[in-house]
Amino acid sequence: MTKELLVSNKLGIHARPAAMFVKVANRFSCEIFVEKDGEKVNGKSIMGLMMLAAGPGSKLKVHASGHDASQALVELETLVKRKFDEE
């Protein structure tokens, strides 16, 4: 399953939002990958997410596979749409 998300918080995905994303992702057993501009990283890796350099306005594709993939995508989408509780 894949969900396209728009990074809309003011500073993009820096250390704190990356940690929040990984904390949510790690609650699920499914595999989660995040893709930006053709570069794909493990969605359960803070360093991987930060290496995407996803600033405000970046479009991400979040891929999840496994038995709880749909719930993982719903919760990750909610987190991103809430702007990582930064605003």
What are these regions (language model features)?
Residues 1-3:
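Absolute protein N-terminus
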Residues 6-47, 51-56, 73:
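Compact, glycine-rich, soluble single-domain proteins
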Residues 51-87:
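C-terminal structural segments of small proteins and small subunits
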